[in-house]
Design a protein with these regions (language model features):
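Short active-site loop/helix that positions an aromatic residue
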Residues: 260-270
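Catalytic core of PPM/PP2C metal-dependent serine/threonine phosphatase domains
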Residues: 21, 52-121, 138-139, 190-218
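Regulatory cytosolic signal-relay segments
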Residues: 1-19
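Short active-site oxyanion
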Residues: 103-104, 248-253
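Primarily the active-site beta-strand->alpha-helix module of PP2C/PPM metal-dependent phosphatases
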Residues: 24-80, 152, 164-176
Length: 390
């Protein structure tokens, strides 16, 4: 076992005028350090394509979750998928990325654009072996992983972007490589890299995609622990225990809440220094405690972080806000979304008397709900989450 992990981001653009996407992505965790990503592209667009791509990805991911070999999965799906009598091609193509113990990647590709691998900021031509299964050419590759490797899987909507419009022959694979290479060493998350790629595809389509367009980016990175403390414990006698556990953990430490930060400052025997800067008038200012990486207000700030997290999982349109702003919510978002891989929440159950004012839209249940919903969003981002209550 090593300290590498996978950071995964994906997004789709629907064919112009269609409610459903004809591409589908399934992600299956086999264990803590092995994961399978399946991208399927159904023939055509609309409902039929959506059903066929979903069927393809579900069959492959389900078989792999059951422990079957990749060759068996490929053989089954290749033999199962029919070939269109008119077009002479399979009803659904697929790309499989399997990361084993965060040490090796297995790539299986059938009729989708070949996966791009960026290594050390440049395109890396990995070896491919051709398998012939039931008359279908399947490309297979095995690659030893390195930190900062970036895999880009895509449907043919990406390489068709701009065809007959801004580009005569579409956005070819080599063009996508040239476009993405400058972003490889910047440190962007997989989701951000994926958003950059899909936004460019959408521009080439002039906002009216002529095909379902999907990209999935997987970035290999080292694990980074993060710790967030919010709320004092329900039993005041547990303050020392809660603080000892929190500050003993490896990684950066975030303290949220006025009372909580006062307790943390007392525990560390350091002064709590408030700031008067309001980078965002909607978010209370941060404070500073020596030995703590970030000190913020509680419920209002976390509520904003939750909104950013929900948007991040959707279209990531708020990225341009939280990626550079200096308010507490934006700083927490950068730490949790971009830096952290393993996040420990320490949640105090004490009731804040100030929140019991019936004229305020804040109460104890809202604080618990915010933590639960934020934890769920972070899990969907692929983070390992542990929540401890006091």
């Amino acid at each position: 076992m090593n300290d590498l992990c996978t950071d995964i981001g994906y997004r789709s653009l629907n064919h112009d005028g269609e409610q459903l996407c004809g591409d589908h992505i399934d992600i299956v965790e086999q264990d803590d350090d092995s994961i399978v990503v399946v991208l399927a592209d159904g023939l055509g667009s609309g409902v039929k394509a959506s059903i066929l791509s979903t069927l393809t990805s579900k069959i492959i991911s389900t078989m792999m979750a059951a422990g079957m070999k990749i060759e068996d999965c490929v053989s089954t799906i290749a033999a199962t998928l029919p070939v269109c009598s008119v077009r002479g091609v399979a009803y659904s193509t697929f790309t499989i990325l399997r990361f084993v113990q965060n040490r090796e990647a297995e790539i299986i590709q059938y009729d989708n654009p070949h996966v791009i691998l960026l290594r050390d900021g440049q395109n890396y031509e990995y070896p491919r072996t051709v398998m012939n299964i039931d008359g279908k050419e399947i490309y297979s590759s095995r690659i030893t992983l390195r930190e900062n490797d970036i895999f880009i899987a895509m449907s043919d909507g990406c390489i068709h972007a701009g065809v007959g419009m801004k580009l005569n022959f579409g956005w070819e694979r080599k063009d996508i490589i040239n476009f993405m290479e400058p972003f490889a060493n910047v440190g962007f998350t997989a989701k951000t890299l994926d958003t950059i790629l899909l936004d460019e595809c959408n521009k080439l389509y002039d906002g009216h995609p002529g095909d379902d367009t999907t990209a999935c980016v997987v970035r290999i990175r080292r694990r980074e622990p993060m710790n967030l403390l919010i709320g004092p414990p329900s039993n005041p006698d547990d303050c020392s225990k809660m603080m000892s556990l929190f500050f003993s953990k490896e990684g950066k430490h975030i303290v949220c809440g006025g009372t909580t930060s006062s307790i943390a400052a007392e525990f560390l025997h350091k002064p709590l220094v408030p700031t008067v800067d309001y980078p965002d008038p909607e978010i209370p200012p941060i404070a500073r405690i020596e030995g703590v990486d970030l000190v913020t207000e509680g419920v209002i700030t976390i509520n904003k972080v939750l909104k950013y997290a929900q948007d991040y999982l959707a279209d990531n349109e708020s990225y341009t806000q939280w990626s550079y702003k200096k308010d507490g919510a934006s700083q927490i978002a950068r730490l949790l979304f971009e830096e952290a891989t393993d996040i420990n929440f320490y949640v105090g159950r004490a009731v804040n008397p100030a929140h019991q004012n019936p004229n305020l839209p804040i109460n104890f249940n809202i604080k618990m709900r915010l933590v639960d919903e934020l934890s769920t969003c972070l899990k969907q981002m692929g983070k390992r989450i542990k929540v401890s209550y006091f």
